[in-house]
Amino acid sequence: MKKPFYITTPIYYPSGKLHIGSAYTTIACDVLARYKRLMGHEVFYLTGLDEHGQKIQTKAKEAGITPQTYVDNMAKDVKALWQLLDISYDTFIRTTDDYHEEVVAAVFEKLLAQDDIYLGEYSGWYSVSDEEFFTESQLKEVFRDEDGQVIGGIAPSGHEVEWVSEESYFLRLSKYADRLVAFFKERPDFIQPDGRMNEMVKNFIEPGLEDLAVSRTTFTWGVPVPSDPKHVVYVWIDALLNYATALGYGQANHANFDKFWNGTVFHMVGKDILRFHSIYWPILLMMLDLPMPDRLIAHGWFVMKDGKMSKSKGNVVYPEMLVERFGLDPLRYYLMRSLPVGSDGTFTPEDYVGRINYELANDLGNLLNRTVAMINKYFDGTVPAYVDNGTAFDADLSQLIDAQLADYHKHMEAVDYPRALEAVWTIIARTNKYIDETAPWVLAKEDGDKAQLASVMAHLAASLRVVAHVIQPFMMETSAAIMAQLGLAPVSDLSTLALADFPANTKVVAKGTPIFPRLDMEAEIDYIKAQMGDSSAISQEKEWVPEEVALKSEKDVITFETFDAVEIRVAEVKEVSKVEGSEKLLRFRVDAGDGQDRQILSGIAKCYPNEQELVGKKLQIVANLKPRKMMKQYISQGMILSAEHGDQLTVLTVDPSVPNGSIIG
């Protein structure tokens, strides 16, 4: 019997309308939940809202309503969005739910009694929007008065901060720092993608893990501390405990908690809240003597060509405007295909419409249309019985499908959706090529080979059946439509995916309808831009016609052969430290795929005052540069490539999924 599977989104903060960033996380978890169900697991999928906090209280006051009314309205809107996106969650938790608040209060008192929470005082720069405190050195920008005193600043998120000094209860994170590091060493795959764990250790634990303020007295919209009700529980104990309370932890009926928390537990979050989930949450579980989750997946963001989404820039994309125009499945497909694991992805209207036309309409839609039409034309709509090796091309098609199915399952288990879908589209492309190779219109002629024609039709139908199965977690409507046109029931499991498993004597529909009609590219791109509010860009972009220009370079022009002599490789930073006696140099230990690490010295120290942020990054290096001795004692075995802009140097990084030692060229 397969282990129960528990998957969670973060609980979203209902301070505004959710855009495609939040939709991405929720759909990504939904895809995994559906896949695991099809693979025979009992699944519990959790999502919900974080409904407490100062920002909610302030927004409710501005709207002239109570905080409860405000979050009730937001919850209604978010549930409607998840229904539109066909999200198959099992529970939608709200931190204002009575059962959750009761457990939060009880846990707070338990930790207070065991001295994992203590009373102190906190002073620091606080961002209401981020619900987070910052030190002066962490601020993106600092405001000073005429005497040079700091009077305010900007948080890394871009929100303003204010000075806050108040009594607060603290969670003893520092007490558990060594135990957390030991856990990370025992479970190096706990945080995905690779490299993110090193960031957390180097940036937050090694410099000294500070205790965390977990109560506030300057607002009232939260869970009161039972033994000291002028305090309300502040954000992270309240928010993080939802993953346990939703299953029944701390309640009379805890059967789901016993089942699913002892199964396989996956959390998926955006990279901006990784610290809270990778440090605060495991330590909280240690304090409560509860088992650790199996995996914490921190994904990147969808950004625009001109940076992060912003209403003022006219570049915000809401899921509703895409679903209402193009349907649900194109959105789910686009989001899951377009965001590389561990990296950010760029949304453009051109790419969105292009993927619908080229990948969904052309590749998949045309394959289905041609197959159904030919089976009707040549065999009166009945799919011929499947036989192996009816043509010279059958074995190759079958072998490719088997190999791509193995890749698909491997990537699905790794939550690498772009590569899983790439495997599916490799099957689609190979099946389209199979039509051209076998030329059924020739086999159908009077002097043709009817047995081979029958084998071709059977292989086409069987291949489409496989495709309909493996896209089901991503595109439920499309999967059902393909199965219906093939005369089959909707997909219910992924256990029988061999070509030979196609049911005998199946009759396809008499006339198939296009599942993805081709779109007018220019009109639909203009529609998306108009919905985004970017009216200035509509129908005004002219095709770029390249002209021969005089090359501008600070150095002499070189030949391709000269450039080809330079070997640029991907290298992962394992360690980095300042070089004693030098203000400019950093000393790197990198894995460049040589079989053993190499040492490189780079003069970028002034541009990276916190050099540990580079640990885990994958950089570009010149790998075949002659080693040279530096500072009389170090041998530098390569060069780290950086982009120079003004006085600043920025190292060139690559997608974390690219293997170490990969050649760039």
From Swiss-Prot:
List the InterPro entries hit by this protein, alphabetically: Anticodon_Met, Met-tRNA-synth_bsu_C, Met-tRNA_synth, Met-tRNA_synth_2, Methionyl/Leucyl_tRNA_Synth, MetRS_core, NA-bd_OB-fold, Rossmann-like_a/b/a_fold
Q: Which residues bind ATP?
A: 311
> Care to name a GO molecular-function term for this sequence?
tRNA binding
* Motif ('KMSKS' region) on chain: 308-312
Top-level taxon of origin: Bacteria
Q: Where is this motif: 'HIGH' region?
A: 12-22
Recorded GO cellular component terms are: cytoplasm
- EC code: 6.1.1.10
Known catalytic reactions: tRNA(Met) + L-methionine + ATP = L-methionyl-tRNA(Met) + AMP + diphosphate
The record's listing under Gene3D superfamilies reads:
2.170.220.10, HUPs, Isoleucyl-tRNA Synthetase, Domain 1, Nucleic acid-binding proteins
Keywords, ordered alphabetically: Aminoacyl-tRNA synthetase, ATP-binding, Cytoplasm, Ligase, Nucleotide-binding, Protein biosynthesis, RNA-binding, tRNA-binding
Q: What CDD domains does the entry give? A: Anticodon_Ia_Met, MetRS_core, tRNA_bind_EcMetRS_like
- Indicate where this protein resides in the cell: Cytoplasm
Enzyme class comes to ligase
Residue span(s) of domain tRNA-binding: 562-665
- Name a biological process GO annotation: methionyl-tRNA aminoacylation
Q: Which PROSITE patterns match?
A: TRBD (PS50886)
Does the UniProt entry include the keyword Nucleotide-binding?
yes
Q: What does this protein do?
A: Is required not only for elongation of protein synthesis but also for the initiation of all mRNA translation through initiator tRNA(fMet) aminoacylation.
Similarity remark: Belongs to the class-I aminoacyl-tRNA synthetase family. MetG type 2B subfamily.
Q: Partners and quaternary state?
A: Homodimer.
The molecule here is called Methionine--tRNA ligase
Organism name = Streptococcus pyogenes serotype M6 (strain ATCC BAA-946 / MGAS10394)
